[in-house]
């Protein structure tokens, strides 16, 4: 069985899967793994091999050690790199800037180009590069492919992509809307073609990727025309710990009046804000329970979250002119029926009618949650970025 190794390397963790690129969307990966607490006193490797869970705790010095130890553990259970047919390695890379609009075969030159983009993604691209360099050393004889979160949004028209800031400054420092979660938005907007009785080029879709990080996209005939995240993943919707859209003047206000440094403000807006900053939690199950218990902070946080979803929904309905379907995906989008219900409440005049019973069904594959007479079809489609990356990567092994 030909397999692709898919790597998502973070600052202190590595997520990976061994995936058959020929899998159906609902098929489980052959192996999934998580290396966490890299560089701390004690780290942990969690493997799931054909449904069986394997856990190992040990100090993990760096990404190289984490991946090597994971491969050793896989070998102990009969699925190491020398025991299975790995035909390609796909790497999730957060930021491709304006340089990369499609997956790229990784070479030394490509690595340096990704390194040059670190100022645009200082929290993510360095870790992505670590994963690339480690994997290329361990698996030097298979193609390694970079798949960029930003790639799907290279099609944004100038009116959506450019900011009203001095054009010379923007050009010098790469200031523009790049968008993120592109692999997920592209995946679910292509999957919806299987559920609609129309060719892809005739389908206008609004996609909701709602996880701890959250974004929306307007997709016209399979091509992205707008998205909520911007130059960074901080913009747009209210998120688990991120502010989403906020007046840039808040940064100046905090610097001048709270004597906060740029790094402190960065940390505040990325890690201590959003739903958690407003309510104390960023798990929507906890938030929902707090609301039912009468917690006013939780209620306020939820209302702000829903308000922002509806603002972007209205904006994208106008941008597209005609909307054929809405798609919810990712952790919150797939599992929080109350978010979907409240985000779309009262929109019957626009042809959006959610079926309450369908909406509350458990998350079990792609499904329609709108009524039969809803002009705009509403779907829940589980995202599968790993399968998408595996398929992109396998093409380079053909």
Swiss-Prot record:
UniProt-recorded Gene Ontology molecular function terms: acetate kinase activity; ATP binding; magnesium ion binding
Cofactor stoichiometry and binding remark: Mg(2+). Can also accept Mn(2+).
Keyword check for Kinase: yes
Binding residue positions for Mg(2+): 8, 385
UniProt keyword list: ATP-binding, Cytoplasm, Kinase, Magnesium, Metal-binding, Nucleotide-binding, Transferase
Cofactor(s) essential for the protein: Mg(2+); Mn(2+)
Pathway(s) per entry: Metabolic intermediate biosynthesis; acetyl-CoA biosynthesis; acetyl-CoA from acetate: step 1/2
Active-site residues (renumbered): 149
GO cellular component, one term: cytoplasm
EC number(s) stated in the UniProt entry for this protein: 2.7.2.1
One Pfam family it belongs to: Acetate_kinase
Keyword Metal-binding in annotation: yes
Extent of the signal sequence: none
Positions annotated to bind substrate: 92
Cell location: Cytoplasm
One GO-annotated biological process of the protein: acetyl-CoA biosynthetic process
Alphabetical list of InterPro entries matching this protein: Ac/propionate_kinase, Aliphatic_acid_kin_short-chain, Aliphatic_acid_kinase_CS, ATPase_NBD
Family statement drawn from the similarity comment of this UniProt entry: Belongs to the acetokinase family.
HAMAP family: Acetate_kinase
Assembly and oligomerization: Homodimer.
PANTHER family for this protein: ACETATE KINASE, ACETATE KINASE-RELATED
Function: Catalyzes the formation of acetyl phosphate from acetate and ATP. Can also catalyze the reverse reaction.
Protein name as catalogued: Acetate kinase
Organism of this sequence: Corynebacterium efficiens (strain DSM 44549 / YS-314 / AJ 12310 / JCM 11189 / NBRC 100395)
Classification of source organism: Bacteria, Bacillati, Actinomycetota, Actinomycetes, Mycobacteriales
Gene: ackA
């Amino acid at each position: 069985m030909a397999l692709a190794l898919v790597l998502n390397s973070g600052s202190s963790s590595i997520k990976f899967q061994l995936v058959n690129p020929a899998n159906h969307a609902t098929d489980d990966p052959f192996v999934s793994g998580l290396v966490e607490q890299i560089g701390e006193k004690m780290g942990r490797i969690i493997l799931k091999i054909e449904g069986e869970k394997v856990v190992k705790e040990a100090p993990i010095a760096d990404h190289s050690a984490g991946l090597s130890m994971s491969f050793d553990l896989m070998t102990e259970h009969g699925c190491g790199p020398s025991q299975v047919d790995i035909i390609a390695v796909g790497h999730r890379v957060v930021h491709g800037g304006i340089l990369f609009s499609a997956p790229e075969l990784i070479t030394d030159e490509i690595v340096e180009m990704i390194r040059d983009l670190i100022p645009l993604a200082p929290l993510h691209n360095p870790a992505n590069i670590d994963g690339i360099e480690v994997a290329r050393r361990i698996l030097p004889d298979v193609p390694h492919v970079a798949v960029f979160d930003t790639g799907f949004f290279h099609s944004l028209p100038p009116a959506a992509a450019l900011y009203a800031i001095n054009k010379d400054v923007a050009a010098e420092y790469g200031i523009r809307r790049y968008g993120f979660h592109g692999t997920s938005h592209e995946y679910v907007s292509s999957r919806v073609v299987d559920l609609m009785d129309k060719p892809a080029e005739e389908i206008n879709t609004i996609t909701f990727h709602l996880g701890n990080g959250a974004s929306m996209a307007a997709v016209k005939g399979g091509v992205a025309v707008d998205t909520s995240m911007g130059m960074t993943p901080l913009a747009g919707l209210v998120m688990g710990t991120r502010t989403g859209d906020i007046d840039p003047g808040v940064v100046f206000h905090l610097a001048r009046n709270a004597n906060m440094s740029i790094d402190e403000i960065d940390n505040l807006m990325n890690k201590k804000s959003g739903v958690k900053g407003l309510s104390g939690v960023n798990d929507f199950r906890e938030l929902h329970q707090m609301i039912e218990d009468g917690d006013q902070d939780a209620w306020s946080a939820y209302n702000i979250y829903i308000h922002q979803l509806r603002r972007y929904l209205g904006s994208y309905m106008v941008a597209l002119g005609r909307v054929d379907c809405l798609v919810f995906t990712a952790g919150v989008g797939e599992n929080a029926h109350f978010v979907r219900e409240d985000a779309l409440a009262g929109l019957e005049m626009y042809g959006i009618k959610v079926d309450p019973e369908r909406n509350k069904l458990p998350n079990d594959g792609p499904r329609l949650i709108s009524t039969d007479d809803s002009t705009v079809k509403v779907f829940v489609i589980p995202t599968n970025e790993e399968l998408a990356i595996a398929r992109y990567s396998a093409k380079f092994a053909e």
